[in-house]
Curated annotation (Swiss-Prot):
Annotated GO CC locations: cytosol
GO MF assignments: DNA binding; DNA ligase (NAD+) activity; metal ion binding
Keyword terms, alphabetized: DNA damage, DNA repair, DNA replication, Ligase, Magnesium, Manganese, Metal-binding, NAD, Zinc
Residues in BRCT domain copies: 636-714
Annotated organism of origin: Nitrobacter hamburgensis (strain DSM 10229 / NCIMB 13809 / X14)
Keyword Cell wall biogenesis/degradation included in the entry's annotation: no
Family according to the record: Belongs to the NAD-dependent DNA ligase family. LigA subfamily.
Active site positions, chain numbering: K132
Lineage of the species this protein comes from: Bacteria, Pseudomonadati, Pseudomonadota, Alphaproteobacteria, Hyphomicrobiales
Name this protein carries in UniProt: DNA ligase
Superkingdom of this protein's organism: Bacteria
Role according to the record: DNA ligase that catalyzes the formation of phosphodiester linkages between 5'-phosphoryl and 3'-hydroxyl groups in double-stranded DNA using NAD as a coenzyme and as the energy source for the reaction. It is essential for DNA replication and repair of damaged DNA.
């Protein structure tokens, strides 16, 4: 049983030697948390726990100033930029804010400003109060009104160049509009994600078996820092502008007027911002925003106060890592203690098995919480995605008294265990190795946190997604049987597995499809004709249609070419699966599969796991009773294009794009989607665009569609 963390002694009671040891430990721990938060977008402690560590470190340094070093977390901002992005030097540092955790500390902040500016006790400086968006800080550089660079905060002095990704965010204007546009300026704000968009993204990630995000801040940061711009573009990121760095000609003299200017030039500015002229009004704003917090569409973790007059901001300047003229008034974490009554397993559309905590109902922030996400089996054991301990390494057991927090106001999370209240009867949780929905065995691939059901073709939880894949364009491509029809036919029990598609006609006298809304006799005849047209299919398309994990269009072709026909493929996979099931030793069939160029361990294991599930094999056998599978002709190695890399561009008149690709592959060529110096041939039709220019740039031969036909027919 894990020991309960000890309460540290008061800082006032520490000797210098004790303080030095604790200072070193705290600094290292905070630096580790900074790296996880700023670089990996995967924090393992709550904001409240992190703030407590910083407060402890600051208290030690206040009592023992000689322990302060240039590298202390109290003297630095964020974390160094991660590898993989170009570094950007900020013209004006992007520093973080000091924190206030009570009304008294806010009043002290205003008093410090008054003393520094030598103002009278009744001369209260105007304060701009704004919600503190919980997202990722971003700096945008504009030159002559045009966006030229975007960078993350990084360590405050050097950030990451994310320009290409930021151009996909609709809230970020590519060109500033209106008048008073400085020759050069750095405009700053926060990238964030709406709560509803975050929940939808996590559902998508969960269904795909990918890592889910802990909160909207992590999802926004992770989405912005993608190497693939297309992924960022697919994520619904938002942006609020609220600050600036370098600026050649400042268009206003107050913070409030600068925010109005930011709106004028095309940015979104938080509409809840208020100008306050007393401490009482500042605190009233804080309480009002706190009451609205749960109903806002986005996450906030406090309120920021800034001196309104910019000349006063300049006079006040900075201290260490933060400005004197601004402070963040943080919200207390919304937590409650309850009992973990059970752990339920949900199965996603792709077989990912996700544990969910069933809790004794408890109210947190005005919301009744009965369930909390547990992410995966490692999370239950007290291990984070990066392999590091979470919750002090304490595992979760049914019957535990747990502390639950509404992470980012959205998804409740179990943040700690009250270990002293653990029942003697509580046992370590055993994550199931079979699917609770269909009973198929569940596997966890090496290097992954997710365990998956292998009953791809027969698991009801996966059925709709698998059937949609089965009839997709690169698989059986059945016209008239789309997502809507698959969903409805499955809900009515008409199609449960692939073979059912091909028995619809004979079952129709009982089903009466023509009586279904949106269908008529003509529609039904057309659907049956489209199904019958797909009773003959190439082996590679069938393999792809099975929806085996890691087996995409390319790998399906590699497998089909290697085995040639369905009988040889089935026999080899059955032998490989049987050997794995019997004694765990690899068979000759597995070795042969694994040695196929381009396949490898991960794909080979996924294929064998599919065939090791007997109900998948039965579903495939039932399907083969209804269809004919054509053997795959071996690619030629003696054609004029064998071994060459070919790119098709523009409109093709004699081929569809898929037919052109297939013709090239039959001739032994490799088809690519982009032109590079490694490309041998570009086949260009009418309307060829950038790929034609790329071919000219790299000196690649360009031919017409007719010339291509002569080449492959000769």
């Amino acid at each position: 049983m894990a020991a309960k963390p000890k309460t540290p002694p008061p800082v006032d009671s520490l000797t210098r030697a004790q303080a030095k040891i604790e200072h070193k430990r705290l600094a290292l721990e905070i630096e580790t948390h900074n790296e996880r938060y700023y670089q990996k977008d995967a924090p393992t402690v709550s904001d409240a726990a992190y703030d407590a560590l910083r407060q402890r470190l600051e208290a030690i340094e206040a009592r023992f100033p000689d322990l302060i070093t240039a590298n202390s977390p109290t003297q630095t901002v964020g974390a160094a930029p991660a590898r993989g992005f170009a570094k950007v030097q900020h013209a004006v540092p992007m520093l973080s804010l000091g924190n206030a955790f009570s009304d008294e500390e806010v009043a002290e902040f205003v008093e410090r400003i008054q003393r520094f500016l030598k103002l009278g006790p009744d001369d209260i400086p105007a304060i701009v109060a704004e919600p503190k968006i919980d997202g990722l800080s971003l700096s945008l550089r504009y030159e002559n009104g045009e966006l030229v660079r975007a960078a993350t905060r990084g360590d405050g002095f050097t950030g990451e160049d994310v320009t290409a990704n930021v151009r996909t965010i609709k809230d970020v204007p590519h060109n500033l509009r209106g008048r008073n546009i400085p020759t050069a300026c750095e405009l700053r704000g926060e990238v964030y994600m709406l709560k509803t968009d975050f929940l939808a993204l996590n559902k998508k990630q969960e269904d795909a078996g990918d890592t889910v995000f802990a909160n909207p801040r992590n999802s926004a940061a992770g989405s912005l820092r993608q190497k693939d711009v297309a992924i960022t573009a697919s994520r619904p990121l938002k942006f609020f502008a609220y600050a600036w760095g370098e600026m050649t000609d400042r268009p206003a003299d107050t913070q409030h007027d600068m925010l109005e200017w930011l709106k004028d030039v095309g940015f979104k500015v938080n509409p809840l911002i208020e100008l306050c002229n007393s401490v009482e009004k500042v605190l009233k704003f804080y309480r009002k925003i706190g009451e609205q917090r749960a109903s806002l569409g986005y996450d906030i973790d406090g309120v920021v106060y800034k001196v309104d007059r910019l000349d006063w901001q300049e006079r006040l300047g900075f201290v260490s890592r933060s400005p004197r003229w601004a402070i963040a008034h943080k919200f207390a974490a919304e937590q409650a203690t309850t009992i973990l009554k059970g752990i339920d397993i949900q199965v996603g559309r792709t077989g990912a098995m996700t544990p969910v905590a069933r809790l004794e109902p408890v109210t947190i922030g005005g919301v009744v919480v009965q369930n909390a996400t547990l992410h995966n089996e490692d999370y239950i054991k007290g291990i984070g995605n990066d392999g590091q301990p979470i919750r002090d390494g304490v595992d979760l057991r049914v019957g535990d008294t747990v502390v639950v927090q509404r992470a980012g106001d959205v998804i409740p999370q179990v943040v700690s265990v009250v270990i002293d209240k653990r029942p003697n009867s509580a046992q370590p949780y055993a994550f199931p190795h079979t699917c609770p929905i269909c009973g198929s065995h569940a596997v966890r691939e090496e290097g992954e946190a997710v365990r998956r059901c292998t009953g791809a073709l027969i698991c009801p939880a996966q059925a709709v997604e698998r059937l949609k894949h089965f009839v997709s364009r690169l698989a059986f491509d059945i016209d008239g049987l789309g997502e809507k029809q698959i969903q409805e036919f499955h809900e009515r029990g008409w199609i449960k597995e692939p073979a059912d598609i091909f028995t619809l006609r004979e079952r129709n006298p009982k089903i009466k499809l023509e009586e279904l809304e949106g269908f008529g006799e003509v529609s039904v005849r057309n659907l049956f004709a489209a199904i019958d047209a797909r009773r003959t299919i190439e082996l590679n398309r069938l393999i792809f249609a099975l929806g085996i994990r890691h087996v995409g269009e390319g790998n399906a072709k590699l497998l089909a070419r290697h085995y040639g026909g369905i009988d040889a493929f089935r026999a080899a996979m059955s032998e490989a699966a049987a050997a794995q099931t019997d004694d765990g030793n690899a068979s000759e069939a597995y070795a042969d599969l694994n040695n196929i160029s381009g396949i490898g361990d991960i794909v080979a294991d996924a294929v064998v796991e599919f065939f090791a599930e007997t109900r998948n094999v039965k579903a495939l056998n039932d399907l083969l009773e209804e269809i004919e599978v054509l053997p795959v002709a071996q690619a030629r190695n003696d054609s004029a294009v064998a071994g060459k890399t070919v790119v098709f561009t523009g409109s093709l008149e004699k081929f569809t794009r898929d037919e052109a690709k297939a013709s090239a592959e039959r001739m032994g060529a490799k088809v690519s989607g982009s032109v590079s110096k490694k490309t041998d041939l570009v086949v260009a039709g009418p309307g060829a665009g950038s790929k034609l220019k790329d071919a000219e740039k790299h000196g690649v031969q360009v031919i017409s569609e007719d010339e291509w036909l002569k080449l492959i027919e000769g």
